[in-house]
Amino acid sequence: MGTPQKDVIIKSDAPDTLLLEKHADYIASYGSKKDDYEYCMSEYLRMSGIYWGLTVMDLMGQLHRMNREEILTFIKSCQHECGGISASIGHDPHLLYTLSAVQILTLYDSINVIDINKVVEYVQSLQKEDGSFAGDIWGEIDTRFSFCAVATLALLGKLDAINVEKAIEFVLSCMNFDGGFGCRPGSESHAGQIYCCTGFLAITSQLHQVNSDLLGWWLCERQLPSGGLNGRPEKLPDVCYSWWVLASLKIIGRLHWIDREKLRSFILACQDEETGGFADRPGDMVDPFHTLFGIAGLSLLGEEQIKPVSPVFCMPEEVLRRVNVQPELVS
C-alpha cells in the first residue's frame, strides 16, 4: 500500500484571477516603514530582498514606482574593499548578495555604480582547486555559489576570469543517479540545487551533459494533486518551487511535461486578496520572496500580463537582451 502524499487542499473560494495591481501596491509599500518588525528582521538578507522586489515590479511593468537613487546609493555603500557586496551596510560580503546587487544594477543599467574589477577579483578569490566556490571567506561550499559566481561574471561580461573548466567538473560531480543535483557530491537531489546547476550549465554551454529526460521525470514528479510543486519527495508544495522546478524544466526543454493549468490554479490560490502578495501556500502570510517567484512562475506559464522572464537569471528577458547575455536552453 502506498504512502499518502503530503499536500494541501485548495478551498473553493481561493483566488482564481491574477490580482496584479494589488501585488504592485504590496511591493511598492513594503519597507516604507523602516521600523516595522518584519523589515528590521530581514536586514540580514536586505540586498536579495531588494532584488526580489525590483525584479517582480519590473516583470509587472511597475519598476518606475521604486526609489532608484536610494537603491543605487545603498548598493554602493555595501561594496567592501575586497570587492564583494554584503546584504546590508556593515554586514560581511557574500556571493549571494554580490549576485543580487549585480542583477539590480543590470536592471537599472547602472553597473558602474560599483567597482566591477573588484567584484571580479572577489569572485575569483572564492574558487577552490576542485573548481567549486565558497560563498564567502568562511568557506561553505555549495553548488548555489557556483551558479552565483558564473551568473555574476556573465552579467559583467567577465566569465573568462575564472577556471570555467574546473567549475564545470565540480558541478557535474554533484549529479546524481536520478538525474538531479545536490549541493555537493553525494548530496540529495533538490529542486533548488537543480535550478542552480542547470542554470550554471546553461551559462557555460554544457547542457548537453544533462540527461534531460531523466531529470525532467524527477522534476515532474514534484507536482502534487493540488497542482503545486515541492522541492523533493514527501514535502509540501510551495510557490517558490513554481520557479525552481518550472525554470529547470524550461532550461532542459521539458516544461510541457507538467499540468500547467493545475499549477497555475495553485499559484493563484496563494495570493492574498486583501493585501496583495503571494504566500508559500494558500492562506499563509505573504512576503516579497514568494511574490517574485509566484509572478515569475506565471510568466513561464505564459501569463500575458507579465513580461517574459529568463529561466536562468530570473530577470526580464528584455534586460538580458540589452546586455547581450543569452544562455543556451534545450529546445
From Swiss-Prot:
<dbReference type="Pfam" id="PF00432">
    <property type="entry name" value="Prenyltrans"/>
</dbReference>
<feature type="binding site">
    <location>
        <position position="238"/>
    </location>
    <ligand>
        <name>Zn(2+)</name>
    </ligand>
</feature>
<keyword id="KW-0479">Metal-binding</keyword>
<feature type="binding site">
    <location>
        <begin position="241"/>
        <end position="244"/>
    </location>
    <ligand>
        <name>geranylgeranyl diphosphate</name>
    </ligand>
</feature>
<dbReference type="GO" id="GO:0005968">
    <property type="term" value="C:Rab-protein geranylgeranyltransferase complex"/>
</dbReference>
<feature type="modified residue" description="N-acetylglycine">
    <location>
        <position position="2"/>
    </location>
</feature>
<keyword id="KW-0007">Acetylation</keyword>
<protein>
    <recommendedName>
        <fullName>Geranylgeranyl transferase type-2 subunit beta</fullName>
        <ecNumber>2.5.1.60</ecNumber>
    </recommendedName>
</protein>
<dbReference type="InterPro" id="IPR026873">
    <property type="entry name" value="Ptb1"/>
</dbReference>
<dbReference type="GO" id="GO:0018344">
    <property type="term" value="P:protein geranylgeranylation"/>
</dbReference>
<keyword id="KW-0677">Repeat</keyword>
<feature type="repeat" description="PFTB 2">
    <location>
        <begin position="68"/>
        <end position="109"/>
    </location>
</feature>
<feature type="repeat" description="PFTB 5">
    <location>
        <begin position="212"/>
        <end position="253"/>
    </location>
</feature>
<feature type="binding site">
    <location>
        <position position="290"/>
    </location>
    <ligand>
        <name>Zn(2+)</name>
    </ligand>
</feature>
<feature type="repeat" description="PFTB 6">
    <location>
        <begin position="260"/>
        <end position="302"/>
    </location>
</feature>
<keyword id="KW-0862">Zinc</keyword>
<feature type="repeat" description="PFTB 3">
    <location>
        <begin position="116"/>
        <end position="157"/>
    </location>
</feature>
<dbReference type="GO" id="GO:0031267">
    <property type="term" value="F:small GTPase binding"/>
</dbReference>
<feature type="repeat" description="PFTB 4">
    <location>
        <begin position="164"/>
        <end position="205"/>
    </location>
</feature>
<comment type="function">
    <text>Catalyzes the transfer of a geranylgeranyl moiety from geranylgeranyl diphosphate to both cysteines of Rab proteins with the C-terminal sequence -XXCC, -XCXC and -CCXX, such as RAB1A, RAB3A, RAB5A and RAB7A.</text>
</comment>
<comment type="similarity">
    <text>Belongs to the protein prenyltransferase subunit beta family.</text>
</comment>
<keyword id="KW-0637">Prenyltransferase</keyword>
<dbReference type="GO" id="GO:0006888">
    <property type="term" value="P:endoplasmic reticulum to Golgi vesicle-mediated transport"/>
</dbReference>
<feature type="binding site">
    <location>
        <position position="240"/>
    </location>
    <ligand>
        <name>Zn(2+)</name>
    </ligand>
</feature>
<feature type="modified residue" description="Phosphothreonine">
    <location>
        <position position="3"/>
    </location>
</feature>
<dbReference type="GO" id="GO:0004663">
    <property type="term" value="F:Rab geranylgeranyltransferase activity"/>
</dbReference>
<feature type="repeat" description="PFTB 1">
    <location>
        <begin position="20"/>
        <end position="61"/>
    </location>
</feature>
<feature type="binding site">
    <location>
        <begin position="190"/>
        <end position="192"/>
    </location>
    <ligand>
        <name>geranylgeranyl diphosphate</name>
    </ligand>
</feature>
<dbReference type="InterPro" id="IPR045089">
    <property type="entry name" value="PGGT1B-like"/>
</dbReference>
<dbReference type="InterPro" id="IPR008930">
    <property type="entry name" value="Terpenoid_cyclase/PrenylTrfase"/>
</dbReference>
<dbReference type="InterPro" id="IPR001330">
    <property type="entry name" value="Prenyltrans"/>
</dbReference>
<keyword id="KW-0597">Phosphoprotein</keyword>
<dbReference type="GO" id="GO:0008270">
    <property type="term" value="F:zinc ion binding"/>
</dbReference>
<keyword id="KW-0808">Transferase</keyword>
<comment type="subunit">
    <text>Heterotrimer composed of RABGGTA, RABGGTB and CHM; within this trimer, RABGGTA and RABGGTB form the catalytic component B, while CHM (component A) mediates peptide substrate binding. The Rab GGTase dimer (RGGT) interacts with CHM (component A) prior to Rab protein binding; the association is stabilized by geranylgeranyl pyrophosphate (GGpp). The CHM:RGGT:Rab complex is destabilized by GGpp. Interaction of RABGGTB with prenylated PTP4A2 precludes its association with RABGGTA and inhibits enzyme activity. Interacts with CHODL.</text>
</comment>
